[in-house]
Amino acid sequence: MLNSIIPDLNFIEYGGGQIAYRESGQGPTILLFHGMNGSSKSWASLFNSLGDKFRLVAWDAPSFGESDVFGDSIEDYTNAAKALISSLEVEDIIIIGHSMGGLIATRLAGDKDVSRAGFVLSSCHLGFGRPKGEALMSRYADRINALTEREVDMSYALERAQRSTPEGTPKHVREYLVEVAKGARMELSLIHI
């Protein structure tokens, strides 16, 4: 059901690879940055509910969804996001970042070269990165190890969907989140956030 309302993928060339994104609607531009294990599909309900009032652009961060693998730091992701913004030729964007996407959104909000009209953070944190060689916090290391050990299987996807939704979440929403989580890739173990 939610899959039927998301727009097709578009791509820009960047860093020797491609960044995937979805775009629809007209009006002020809202740029959407998903969290870890997410993708542009994470924003399906917004495409449905806001697409008639806003131009929505949701990316697949590098190493997520259909974007190519490159870069392993928030700085790398922020530079990729700036390339996407530049390719869209927009000013006064509204930036929305969820979880890991909030780290990127925060960097963009503080960048004098990014023209923005608004800024929204959802379920964000200051970042729990560690110097190279130092262990990640256990909750992030456990998520990455789960991907590494069993790749992405149905049990991993079900676990992620259940942990990220409250009791009483409609079945079709959880099923969609399972589909999004199944798209997580092994390359996530390389990311330094």
Task: Identify the residue ranges that each predicted region occupies.
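Gly/Ala-rich beta-loop-alpha elbow adjacent to hydrolase catalytic centers
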Residues: 97, 101, 105
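N-terminal cap/lid segment of alpha/beta-hydrolase-fold proteins
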Residues: 2-18
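Structural signature of beta-strand start/N-cap positions in the alpha/beta core
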Residues: 29, 55, 91-94, 115-118
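Conserved HGGG/HGGXW glycine-rich cap/lid loop of the alpha/beta-hydrolase fold
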Residues: 17-66
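Helix-loop "lid/cap" segments that line or gate small-molecule binding pockets
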Residues: 142-149, 157-169, 179-181
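Active-site loop/oxyanion-hole signature of alpha/beta-hydrolase fold enzymes
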Residues: 45-48, 57-96
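Conserved small/polar residues in nucleotide/adenosyl-binding loops
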Residues: 191-193
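Flexible "cap/lid" loop of the alpha/beta hydrolase fold
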Residues: 106-111, 115-149
